[in-house]
């Protein structure tokens, strides 16, 4: 996806314009994803890429209610090898286990990110080692940088004075928002030791306190807004 086409898709979504009347955007958008859709990455390696199934529908519903972004009816699902990868400006990856990319997938993901795409990876406890390994293959010369609490991502829509919130108290480590940059643009955001996806899930699944669920949804909103406007 070129930066121009990505910008058209984003502008149509944020301004409330139907993608059907934005020809360049429509050409890059499947019929079932009219409006902005978060695309879940289906990856190889044995990890449960499909975990937290109610998380993205709930986050997208929250975005519809609390932003002016025109949202699709449901999230998408994409494999790095899929022809329509470049029609999705925003990828989401999560799971508890091993993440593995083939060499062609490494090259293709790098091309996607360099062309203006964005990847949000949410640590669901168990994928950390393999995800960091694969990102080092994608960008051998880049290292994750922790975003400070005063970074604009934490106040672009909702205010998070202390940075990334801790949603699921799995092992007591502090949450970190880690980023890979291409110049000044975040191309990969890795939310580590936070487990935002658990907070996006239906309330009865993890029994997270309501303030934690709200914080997770608000943080997810900030990430989407930041990715689409930067």
Indicate where each model-derived feature is located.
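Aromatic-Pro/Gly-enriched surface loop or interdomain linker
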Residues: 24-90, 96-97, 187, 195-196, ...
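N-terminal secretory signal peptides that target proteins for export/translocation
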Residues: 1-5
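An acidic, glycine-rich "communication" segment
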Residues: 46, 54, 128-204, 212-217, ...
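Bacterial N-terminal signal peptides
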Residues: 7-20
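Alpha-helical scaffolding within the catalytic cores
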Residues: 73-80, 102-108, 172-176
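A generic secondary-structure signal for well-formed alpha-helical elements
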Residues: 67, 117, 139-142, 227
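Active-site-proximal beta-strand/loop segments in catalytic clefts of secreted hydrolases
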Residues: 41-44, 81, 93-96, 115, ...
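Short alpha-beta junction capping motif
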Residues: 38, 90-129
